[in-house]
Design a protein with these regions (language model features):
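Long, well-ordered core segments of solenoidal/helical folds
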Residues: 1, 31-48, 119-130
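Active-site lining segments of carbohydrate-active enzymes
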Residues: 1-27, 31-42
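Carbohydrate-binding/catalytic loop surfaces
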Residues: 1-11, 49-89, 133-162
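Carbohydrate-binding surfaces of carbohydrate-active enzymes
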Residues: 105-114, 247, 274
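Beta-strand-rich binding/interaction modules
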Residues: 237-258
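A surface-exposed beta-strand-loop module
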Residues: 254-283, 292-298
Length: 409
């Protein structure tokens, strides 16, 4: 199981994956697979973040063995222990999650690992740096409330200098190296793991140098256009494959070469591919449906039970209090299961983002001052809300924020 300091743990798992790649020791892979399953299925946030606890104890369960219990710090918690306001989720731990999954992808070629790389990169890694690149988060909580009656260990506003200054350079390094995660190569094959406008110049063993150009507005749109720009003379008689990852969030995709449809029964977390003798100027179009989805959590995740998160493509969305009409509180907003969101481009801090606008329900209640419980207020009214990408929160001044919102069924 995944346990202990989340940054050190994730870097350790990445290192063990490197050892397995060199030695092929099967017990290492067995352990890594078990740890990965524990993280992804029981301990990872929807943003790809890791390390729920700032301080805690381990092991922590129903048994009582005081001599075996130790204090843990900035660590993984119990299975399904995923608090929002107190979530630690150090940026370095989220980067470590990327590094671990990247190595598992290189070893196995399984698209499910690329899915985690993308989820963490677009959400809990990019959230660690402001849109202007000048301010940082050490921790990445999923909720900010103005009413907490206690002080959190780390400030929940972006700052230019962090006393524990590991996350800022680590984030910048990761962003600068993101191109290295876009493609992987195999025998006469190119795998597209991450999508974004770019040019790939590489060499395929037994074939020679090739150049591919990718054109797309991803992650805002699901259409990817790949152009074969240059090929070696030897390739005129040799076929090779181009693979496109079908993400977990995509139910339907189409693949065409020079306008001709390519048949295939592709599934989530798999690769679609075309194998052929290519020509310079060939155009491949890979179009993924990108619906707005409402996600719910496992019922054992008590802090987020009966709540939903909004996701479109790889982007997790959040609600800031400034984006609720009438200046209402995030606590009062509920998301109907039949809500219709409209994607719209806007700028935040000079950066283009895709926001989602829709009509939610508002349960406008009186102040909770001096109360812990009270009778349910059944009165609700519609309210216009705007959701922004989670990575972009905290760039417009201080506000409340939440990723998970109560669901109205």
């Amino acid at each position: 199981n995944a346990m202990g300091h989340a940054v050190r743990s994730n870097y350790l798992y990445a290192g063990v994956a490197d050892v397995y790649a060199e030695t092929g020791e099967e017990q290492l892979m067995k352990n890594l697979t078990s740890i990965w399953s524990d993280i992804v299925n029981r301990k990872m946030y929807v943003t790809g973040a890791c390390g729920a606890l700032y301080d805690g104890t381990s092991p922590d369960g129903t048994f009582y063995e005081p001599d075996s219990i130790q204090k843990v710090h900035q660590s993984y918690g119990r299975p399904y222990q995923l608090p929002n306001s107190t979530a630690h989720n150090e940026t370095c731990a989220n980067i470590g999650n990327m590094l671990f999954n990247w190595r598992m992808l290189e070893i196995t070629g399984d698209a499910k690992y690329a899915e985690i790389v993308e989820t963490a990169l677009y959400n809990s890694v990019l959230s660690g740096i402001s849109l202007d690149g000048l301010k940082y988060f050490y921790t990445n909580p999923l909720r900010i409330s103005a009413d907490l009656p206690y002080t959190l260990r780390w400030p929940k506003v972006r700052t230019e200098y962090i006393s524990c200054f590991c996350c800022p350079p680590n984030t910048l390094r990761t962003v600068c190296q993101a191109q290295n995660y876009a493609y992987t190569l195999a025998d006469k094959a190119v795998y597209c793991n991450l999508y974004g406008s770019n040019t790939l110049q590489t060499e395929l063993e037994g074939l020679g140098k090739i150049a591919l150009a990718q054109h797309t507005d991803y992650p805002w749109e699901g259409s990817v256009r790949l152009v074969v720009e240059s090929l070696p003379r030897a390739s005129r008689k040799t076929a090779f494959s181009i693979y496109f990852r079908m993400p977990e969030w995509c139910d339907k995709a189409t693949l065409t070469v020079n306008g001709q449809a390519v048949a295939g029964n592709w599934k989530r977390n798999e690769y679609a591919h075309v194998n052929r003798i290519w020509k310079e100027g060939d155009i491949v179009e890979w179009v993924m449906d990108m619906p707005v989805r409402l996600l719910e959590a496992h019922p054992l995740a008590e802090e987020i039970r009966n709540q939903v998160v909004v996701k479109r493509g790889p982007i997790v969305y959040c609600l800031e209090s400034m984006d609720i009409d009438g200046g209402k509180r995030i606590d009062d907003v509920q998301i109907p299961t039949n809500i219709k969101f409209t994607p719209r481009k806007m700028q935040i801090a000079g950066s283009d983002v895709m926001v989602l606008e829709g009509i939610a329900s508002l349960n406008e209640a009186e102040s909770w001052e001096g109360m812990l419980y009270r009778e349910v207020n059944p009165t609700q009214k519609p309210v216009h809300i705007r959701l922004i990408p989670y990575y972009a929160w905290g760039n417009r001044g201080k506000s409340e924020m939440t990723v998970w919102m109560p669901v109205k069924r």
